[in-house]
Each structure stands twice: as structure tokens, then as C-alpha cells.
Amino acid sequence: MAAKDVKFGNDARVKMLRGVNVLADAVKVTLGPKGRNVVLDKSFGAPTITKDGVSVAREIELEDKFENMGAQMVKEVASKANDAAGDGTTTATVLAQAIITEGLKAVAAGMNPMDLKRGIDKAVIAAVEELKALSVPCSDSKAIAQVGTISANSDETVGKMIAEAMDKVGKEGVITVEEGTGLQDELDVVEGMQFDRGYLSPYFINKPETGAVELESPFILLADKKISNIREMLPVLEAVAKAGKPLVIVAEDVEGEALATLVVNTMRGIVKVAAVKAPGFGDRRKAMLQDIATLTGGTVISEEIGLELEKATLEDLGQAKRVVINKDTTTIIDGTGEEAAIQGRVAQIRQQVEEATSDYDKEKLQERVAKLAGGVAVIKVGAATEVEMKEKKARVEDALAATRAAVEEGVVAGGGVALVRVAAKLASLTAQNEDQNVGIKVALRAMEAPLRQIVSNAGEEPSVVANNVKAGDGNYGYNAATEEYGNMIDFGILDPTKVTRSALQFAASVAGLMITTECMVTDLPKGDAPDLGGAGGMGG
């Protein structure tokens, strides 16, 4: 086992604080409308330019191992805030630095670290309740656009695009961000359920100008098996032909004689048919077939549950207003499934999302919810260069996460004002002893730090602005972009309650642990291996 280097008491805390300050100082230059960019060098390719706190934090490793421990613990704050709310990483880092700095001063002055931590925790619990009380629901498109704009560094086009996407696909719909090919941002919306499987034969195409199959009010046959024998399908085909409607077949595969017969029927105009493979593989395919069945009011023909294709009737088939199939995708528009059944299925999948452990599974389940509940919107980010593209895409993703958080828990006044108001309301909060009271004061003083940092980045004097804001009440604050005082809600400067709450909770959690640190242990640096001397008896 390698030898260890151990530091105690103040020595350890001073080193740790130095690491915290290096990381936090690098991150906090990005805060606010006048925050600056940080350039990150990469081992290959062009440097990355970013204004995203967590991206900066992730890049920082310090040479001194004790300082690095401090930096890594604050990096954890930014990562946790990013995971929970998708934004607010810089705010969380600034809060953590402020609590640690003030807390360690109190420890150096002889306060009991455990009582300080209890005081900080008590203040944060009370502050979260106050934030919830200040929060107002974020339901209209204008508020959603404002939240997106602020999170995307005052880029109004991004805010409007996110609001439009949410309008189109609903609050539950999936909105994804991709790199576009042009200079302009674009929004693509797919209404209805779309999955990535195209037609099995180009002979099904009935719209040659678009290269697509478009069927109006078709029946939809869902089969969890390979279909190669046409005899199995004859009863269904005859029933559909009598009804005079088209048929879409979604099966594990349709091949051989069965596919050839369907093509011939289509070309002769006996019955309009199109066949596609079922989406997904294995268990996910079974689940997605069941989703389509719920959406269209049909039944999945599966031998596992004793249903045979030969015995299928029109009652087993789903229906939709329209189905569009092209080379790579199939879109089912306005399925005729019962609303109650669809909502039940959505609730069931949501439960699976809660229980899912991997991010990949969660993402796939969320996509299924969106396909059932509304639709899918894709924001394609446009930019002139690769470097700008990466920076802009990160901003749009942050803005999207912030708007989701706002819809979930509401919004409070932005620009650090909400935390200043909360601190003022909790000024009379007390605890069991004097050391805990100092802990409460440490937390309340730290709540001013985001406002002060925003002002500092805008080139103004933080103390003057902080005092002016404290002299006002409600949503009165300072707009750093225009250097005006006024109502933050009227200015359109809103922060999602969830983002502010998460930032405070994670910052206090890690800061409280760091304040109570008394000893730090790390590996001693390995010395260079000694040179081997010349072998005996050999001339030099």
C-alpha cells in the first residue's frame, strides 16, 4: 500500500479552501447576463468555448492533491444541480463557495463545526419552504419563453422556440436538441406517434412525388410474429377488403409469399395495404406494439396470449385517421384508442420511469410517453462554426432543462432576488445555541452571493446594488443587462423555483460536510525511480 500524506485542522482546511476558490472563481465568471466565456483546451480538436458552469467545473483538476479534493467536492455540487434541474450549476457553485468561506472563518474563530452545520441545515430547510411560498406557476407561453431566454443567456430566439415546441407537443412531449446543418435554428414537430421503421417494399408507395405511402382511415393489424404464410392472413384481408378500407400491417417481419401477395394485391388495387416491421427489439418491441395497440384501439395478435392470426377479426384491428410511411419512418396520426386507456398506459410507463435505474432506459421510456401523450419536437441548432455550434447547443439544452423545471415547480424572481428576499424573511430565525445561530447567519449571508456575483460580472459595485435591492421588497431587483432597477417579473427575468432550490440544497449539503472536515488523507507523490547503475565488471 502506498504511503499517505495526512493534514489536520487548519492546515487541511486552508488547502481545501484554496481548491474550492480556484474552481469557483473559474466557474463564477460565467454568471448573469454579462458573464464572460471560459475557453477549455482539448487534447484534440479546437478548444471549446462555454458559458455553462458545469462544463467549466468538469474540466478542472489541480496538481496539489489536497487542493484538488476541495475542488472536486465543489464540482460535485455543480454536477448534482445539473442532474436534478439541468441548470443553476453556476449559482450552486457560488453559493457553495460563499457558505464554505464564511463557515471556515467561523470555525477558525472557535465555533463548533457540527453546530455550524446544524444551523446551516436549519436555515436551508426554512429557505426552501419560503421559496415554495414565493413560487408562482409557470403555465403560459410567455413565461416559458422568458425562462428559456434567461437560461440561454438572454437569447430570445431560443426562448421563443422552446415555448413554441412546448405549445406544439404539450408539457409531456419529448423535445430534443440536435446539431443543425444551416445557420438558422429550426424547429421540426412530429405530431402523432412516429417510429423508425419504413415500408417493407417500395411497391406500397402511393404518393410517388413524395416517395411515401399515405393511407386515410386505415385498419391497423399488430402481430408479434413473423408472417411468411399468406393463408394466415386471408380472413383479415377479406374482411378489410369488404369494409373498403386500407390496411397497415405492423409485425416482427413480413416476408416471402406473404409479402409478395400483399404487393400484388396493392398493385392490382384489390386492397390497399402497407407492411412495416415493428419498432424496437425483444421486450421493448412487445411494449411498443402494446403502445400502438392502446393508441389505435386494437389488440396485439400474439401466440403468447393464445391469439392466432387466422382467427383475427376486424374487432382486433386498430384504427387511425391517417398513417404516413416513408423509407425510414412510420407516423400514426389520430389513433382511435380510448382516452382513458391511453392515460392509463401513460401512467404505467411513468411508473417505470420512476423505477428505471439507467439513463438510457429512462430516455427510451420518456420517448414512449411522448409518443402516446403528444408528439416529438426537434430543435435543430444552427451556427456558422463547429465551436459556436457546440457552445450554442449546450445553452439550448440548459434552457430546455430550465423551462421543464419551471413548468414542474413554478418560477420566482430571477437575478438572485428570490434568495435575497428569502434571507430577509428568515432574519429572525434562531436555533438551540449561539454556534447554530452563527450557522444560520452564514447560510443567510451566502444567499446574497449570486446577486453580488451577477452585479460584479456586470462591472458594478456589488454592495451598493445589494443594499438597494434589499431596501425594496417583493420582486424589486436589478436588471444587470440594462443596469436598471424594477420589477423582475415585468423585466421577464425569471428563475425556475426548482433550479434555485436545488442549487441551495446541494451547495449547503457539500459545504456543511467540508466545514466539519478535520483531517485529509491523500497518497504521497511517487518519487522518480532511481537510475540503475552499470552492471559490475563492465567497462564504462
From Swiss-Prot:
InterPro entries: Chaperonin_Cpn60_CS, Cpn60/GroEL, Cpn60/GroEL/TCP-1, GroEL-like_apical_dom_sf, GROEL-like_equatorial_sf, TCP-1-like_intermed_sf. SUPFAM superfamilies: GroEL apical domain-like, GroEL equatorial domain-like, GroEL-intermediate domain like. Gene3D superfamilies: GroEL, GroEL-like equatorial domain, TCP-1-like chaperonin intermediate domain. GO terms for cellular component: cytoplasm. CDD domains: GroEL. GO terms for molecular function: ATP binding; ATP-dependent protein folding chaperone; isomerase activity. NCBIfam families: GroEL, PRK00013.1, PRK12849.1, PRK12850.1, PRK12851.1. Forms a cylinder of 14 subunits composed of two heptameric rings stacked back-to-back. Interacts with the co-chaperonin GroES. Belongs to the chaperonin (HSP60) family. This is Chaperonin GroEL. It comes from Pectobacterium carotovorum subsp. carotovorum (Erwinia carotovora subsp. carotovora).
